[in-house]
């Protein structure tokens, strides 16, 4: 085993050289078009120091100013004698003791860290992926079992659903769901986007479930029935646990695709990760830097998901 691992090191080194070569080629390509890299503009789109103006509530006078480090505590007294105390950053203070102030005058600002557009876009992508993925799994499990049902109506309806959804583009489905169904039922764009993604994912999960159940030998079901289990108990306790091990890889692949498909909901004005990236480019003019960051954030979501699915698959295989 040790010899085998040592023999693989040159190949891993070659892989690293290829990746370095690709990165260098990309750098040279950008140099040829005179692109100027501005990575220093990117961090503010993840987190930045937000300013919140502190204003006088009424007419009055600056009664006292107490400086403490980088902060200043300003005490205002109005005509009735009531006091208003404001904490502001010292360098933003615009008044001195004894100055008169009017209602709405800015005394200074307070600064605090706030999430930038890319951070909010990442959060939106995550919650849309989780919610639509969970709903899609439930829809797909139900539709997949309906496709195997002995009831012709359930089988026909589930077949129509699966073929209709799989046969049309997701982008078209989002438009139909938002502009037609959403208008009739007065749905929010977030609800429409999640519903469209869930129905789309459910159709593919249904086919994965159907194929997984059908891959289990019929003898398994017959053996379960011979032990006194009914059809539902046989499916729940015997067939589905075995099928789950087989459908785990395609299910993981489907959910990874779902994370990337969330970028399409930007067409109905949902500011997820891709739309946040486009908006950041319009103000930073750092096209390549922003898109590389967006791609990296998608990888940050999908690589752990893929790794988790692989580990779960190996653990289930060891339990056999």
Where are these regions (language model features)?
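Transmembrane alpha-helices and adjacent helix-loop boundaries
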Residues: 1-90, 94-97, 102-320
